[in-house]
Amino acid sequence: MVINSLLCQDRDLVPHFLPIDFSETKEAAKRNVRSKQLAGKALANGVPLILFPSGHVSTADAPGFGDVVDAPWTTFIAKLIMQYQPTVVPVFFHGQNTRLFHIASNIADPFRMAMHMREALKRFGTTVSLDVGRHHSPEDYSHITSRQEMTTHFYNIVQATRRARD
């Protein structure tokens, strides 16, 4: 699983994570390159990966209120898909963080990161609702030639996978 490095605190789970560090240091950049290389190796060896395309937790579009929206998806996943041609299974995760998280997210990144850890810890041992779509083999997306088009294609598929929850 490619995941925010702040969430890689459990030593038993660390071997299953490929951490992405959002701090703006040379060391973070090196670690991120390494994680991306390992993601490619995993796909080349047929190991399934769980990837969160925007790289961020969805946040309310107004400070503490409003609809929760994804940050723009990066084209990194499209690059992996185009290079390694895996079968892709879209998953939509339901749920929302607390209002306090959304308020903190609009103040400053350090507050957001602190609240991110708090929200994750609160979710341990709880049920996560998700919708799983049909798999997409390389033949289903081989006609797509640009990373941006591939990103948009799978974004639309994930959004279409979402089912209404009461």
PLM ranges: what are they?
Residues 1-30:
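Catalytic core of membrane glycerolipid acyltransferases/transacylases, capturing the structured
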Residues 33-166:
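Non-catalytic C-terminal accessory region of glycerolipid acyltransferases
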